[in-house]
């Protein structure tokens, strides 16, 4: 029995128990052997936050043959099942943050230590990097991101559609005013021309198939990547719908495309594929819950044996101390496991599965940039001391951030129609900017949020909490009225890479668990104390970004008087009609609106990717140079950051790394040959073929089949069950399949043919036969196959039926031909009646085949033509083969002319099946 849901002071932790396992449960499961296979972990993902969850989910969904196990280790607890803004307003955001050692003047708070991490409370802004922002990125990687992975990640987080939850007169008027203002370059010289920007994702990715892993987890197919077809052209009518225009609107196509570029690229899915609920604002937790549910469903129960069948386990509240490595003879470093400390402060080692078939297990570091770097340094400071470790922690980059909040009269919005509408409305817009500094373009953008057109009432805070992208701006937005609109222009700008004043090192002063914590130093550009060449560029970039905010603010004010909110000291500063950008800057100087560097929590770069091991830390797939199997899946990989939030790019890289691990690194099922000529596969070892099979058996019996490593493996200790191919019945056929037993003393199973649908009531004659033998078909419909079809037996022990009488003796003796491997079960085969000296009747012509040997694949060829049955048994290793039985059916009630095919799960007798073919 597994750990039950625990009672806290206020709640019953059913969701945490559903999602998570204890460390002991995970370690115990790894010691179990299932179908002759050890069940150690093939991939250990360190970090259950945003990118760890994405990576692990992708690994799970990519595994088409169910061949590997994934373990997620998270130091924080489980707190929320989805993004905080998808839930009722509770007056704030979750704050399970843990600080790290840092430069004393910067005061970092740390990231969310919880399953889902930053994705539980982020703002959702997800613009894509421009081509020019991929500074120092490997070209092959950039090409793959643009050709495939940005589309996939956009679909996954919900940024590939327009924001149809942000609409209304306010939004339309603000967008039009901004569009008109940016149309004159002199008005906003720091803005990039809309014509020079790529189309909105809703246009770029229109018509492309869904890649969202939530849909895949719900049964929409495997997670394997497929080529992306060219996007069809979006019609003018569709553009009008995306923009909220009337069908009669005459705006030109080029203007509509440019207007869409001003739409905020928010990770909010309000519409989904048919049959799938939208997830609203993206968080990695719902997807993790989906795959955890799938893993639990596959396991068929609770407890150690069931946990061993689980392909994914999540263990929270576990601190990873370091990664265990060994240096090979070729000087490459291989990871063999991880060392952790459990909730009882006991250190334990979780080993990785050993190499198999030329492939190996892997560890994926998926923490935030700071903690990923700490773990990498603590692990590799010696083994990679003269190599990648000497660069780890350098290239720390984050974002420059400023906030300008203004309140304008609604009369400033020249295209806002007169209306009696009084609903509280919100708007979200996006402007990209750049400035050429030191001979190179430096990029930034504005995230524009607005609210207004109604007086705020007692529920307005809760309403705005749901409507605005950034909950940090909630207080500012509460200044909106029915006569005024509040607008916050948040500037986000890139920092220059490879700044020697920005780095992470292991703290010389502070340690936890005898291991140094991360000490963070980030160039202090805000106060100007850092004067490196990179910092001086960043100062100019920050000025240009703030200048763009002023330019856009003046566009919105449209010559009307307005207020600056939350200026120095929290004051409100009135601005006169006709104010200029120079006057705005004088009234609210740039330094007064700037946040400290790093407060965006967009830290990145410290384990950056590159093709040259001498100048980077990881390769283009995130593997740490000179290691064989240690990967990173986090923004720490970014060579440069650009201005976008790292979410979209981080998700894309996580998917790409998971795809590589699936295709080229992790252990997998042995590749099987294609079906023989003329045969079609009923089960070919893939998830797609497994979905066509259905289980019949006693409810909640725990007797079933696990799909593992491309095989169907029986398990359980209850009444037998039946797994059958559901889509089709068969008349005359040649069925070929392979099976393997594991215990010579317990190897009972069988192959059923020509039986009726077990979910449909049998004809009276068969129901009466079942009743006569004391069988309740309603309690276990698997018995339907016994009475309506025929079973080709698997049991070299030929165990007798304890409930059967054999010519006056009970129980039935062991060893009868009619109960032996290769026989049609229970059809008389001329067996000796030892107590009478006579023989049973001989209805089937049975001859024993080659012995069934544990661990050896045996093959059945079952040929059925009309009422004629012929079975051949072959030892696939020795080649020994024998026709074991020939049988002509004369029972008109059994063996329907068109029947189903299935395999049996017998109590306490594990048997594996593969390559189930038919012609």
Regions found by a protein language model. Give the residues of each.
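N-terminal Rossmann-fold NAD(P) dinucleotide-binding loop
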Residues: 52
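Carbohydrate-interacting regions of secretory-pathway proteins
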Residues: 671-919
């Amino acid at each position: 029995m597994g750990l039950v849901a625990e009672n806290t002071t206020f709640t019953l932790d059913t969701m945490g128990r559903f999602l998570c396992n204890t460390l002991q449960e995970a370690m115990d499961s790894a010691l179990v052997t299932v179908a002759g296979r050890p069940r150690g972990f093939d991939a250990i993902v360190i970090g259950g936050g945003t990118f760890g969850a994405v990576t692990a989910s992708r690994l799970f969904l990519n595994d088409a043959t169910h061949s590997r196990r994934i373990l997620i280790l998270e130091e924080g607890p489980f707190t929320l099942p989805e993004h905080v803004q998808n839930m009722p307003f509770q007056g704030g955001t979750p704050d399970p943050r843990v600080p790290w050692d840092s430069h004393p003047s910067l005061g970092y708070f740390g990231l969310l230590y919880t399953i889902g991490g930053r994705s539980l409370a982020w703002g959702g802004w997800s613009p894509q990097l421009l081509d020019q922002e991929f500074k120092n990125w490997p070209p092959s990687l950039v090409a793959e991101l643009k050709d495939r992975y940005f589309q996939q990640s956009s679909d996954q987080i919900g940024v590939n559609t327009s924001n149809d939850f942000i609409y209304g007169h306010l939004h339309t008027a603000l967008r039009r005013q901004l569009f008109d203002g940016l149309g004159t370059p002199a008005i906003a010289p720091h803005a990039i021309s809309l014509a020079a920007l790529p189309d909105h994702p809703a246009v770029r990715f229109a018509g492309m198939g869904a890649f969202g892993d939530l849909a895949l987890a719900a049964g929409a197919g495997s997670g394997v990547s497929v080529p992306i077809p060219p996007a069809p052209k979006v019609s003018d009518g569709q553009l009008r719908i995306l923009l909220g225009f009337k069908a009669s609107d005459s705006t030109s196509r080029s203007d509509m495309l440019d207007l869409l570029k001003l739409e905020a690229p928010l990770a909010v899915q309000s519409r989904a594929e048919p049959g799938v609920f939208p997830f609203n604002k993206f968080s990695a937790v719902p997807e993790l819950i989906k795959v955890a549910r799938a893993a639990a469903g596959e396991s068929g129960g609770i407890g150690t044996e069931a946990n061993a069948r689980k392909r994914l386990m999540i263990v929270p509240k576990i601190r990873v101390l370091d990664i265990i490595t060994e240096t090979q003879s070729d000087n490459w470093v291989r990871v063999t496991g991880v060392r952790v400390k459990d909730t009882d402060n006991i250190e334990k080692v979780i080993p990785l599965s050993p190499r198999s078939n030329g492939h190996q297990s892997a560890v994926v570091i998926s923490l935030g940039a700071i903690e990923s770097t700490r773990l990498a340094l603590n692990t590799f400071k010696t083994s990679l001391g003269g190599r990648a470790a000497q660069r780890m922690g350098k290239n720390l980059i984050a974002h420059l951030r400023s906030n300008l909040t203004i309140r304008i009269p609604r009369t400033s919005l020249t295209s806002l129609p007169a209306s009696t509408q009084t609903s509280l409305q919100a708007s979200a817009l996006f402007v990209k900017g750049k400035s050429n500094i030191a001979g190179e373009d430096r990029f930034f953008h504005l995230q524009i949020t607005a609210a207004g057109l109604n007086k705020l009432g007692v529920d307005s805070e809760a309403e705005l909490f749901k409507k605005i992208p950034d909950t940090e701006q909630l207080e500012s937005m509460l200044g909106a009225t029915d006569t005024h609109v509040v607008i916050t222009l948040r500037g986000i700008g890139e920092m220059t890479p490879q700044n020697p004043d920005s780095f992470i090192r292991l703290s010389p002063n502070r340690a936890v668990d005898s291991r140094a914590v991360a000490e963070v130093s980030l160039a202090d550009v805000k106060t100007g104390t850092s004067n490196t060449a990179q910092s001086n560029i960043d100062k100019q970039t920050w000025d240009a970004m703030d200048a763009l905010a002023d330019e856009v603010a003046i566009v919105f004010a449209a010559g009307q008087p307005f207020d600056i909110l939350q200026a120095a000291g929290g004051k409100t500063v009135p601005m006169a009609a006709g104010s200029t950008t120079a006057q705005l800057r004088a009234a609210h100087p740039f330094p007064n609106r700037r946040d400290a560097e790093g407060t965006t929590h967009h830290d990145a770069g410290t384990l950056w990717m590159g093709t040259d091991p001498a100048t980077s830390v990881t390769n283009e797939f995130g593997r740490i140079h000179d290691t064989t199997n240690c990967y990173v899946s986090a923004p720490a990989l970014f060579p440069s950051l650009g201005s976008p939030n790292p979410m979209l790019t981080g998700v894309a890289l996580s998917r790409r790394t998971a795809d590589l691990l699936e295709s080229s690194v992790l252990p997998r099922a042995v590749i099987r040959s294609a079906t023989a000529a003329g045969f079609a596969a009923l089960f070919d070892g893939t998830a797609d073929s497994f979905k066509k099979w259905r289980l019949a058996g006693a409810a909640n019996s725990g007797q079933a089949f696990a799909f593992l490593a491309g095989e169907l493996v029986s398990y359980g200790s209850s009444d037998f069950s039946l797994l059958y191919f559901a889509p089709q019945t068969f008349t005359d056929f040649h069925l070929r399949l392979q099976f393997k037993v594991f215990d010579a003393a317990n190897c009972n199973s069988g192959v059923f043919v020509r039986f009726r649908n077990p979910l449909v009531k049998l004809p009276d004659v068969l129901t009466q036969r079942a009743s006569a033998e004391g069988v309740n078909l309603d309690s276990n419909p698997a018995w339907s196959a016994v009475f309506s079809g025929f079973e080709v037996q698997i049991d070299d022990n030929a165990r007798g039926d304890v409930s059967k009488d054999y010519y006056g003796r009970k129980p039935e003796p062991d060893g009868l031909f009619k109960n032996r491997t290769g026989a049609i079960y229970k059809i008389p085969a001329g067996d000796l009646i030892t107590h009478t000296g006579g023989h049973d009747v001989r209805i089937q012509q049975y001859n024993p085949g080659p012995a069934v040997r544990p661990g050896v694949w045996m093959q059945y060829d079952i040929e059925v033509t009309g009422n004629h049955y012929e079975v051949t048994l072959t030892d696939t290793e020795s080649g020994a083969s024998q026709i074991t039985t020939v049988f002509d059916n004369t029972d008109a009630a059994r063996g329907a002319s068109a029947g189903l095919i299935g395999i049996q799960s017998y109590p306490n007798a594990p048997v594996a099946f593969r390559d189930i073919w038919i012609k």
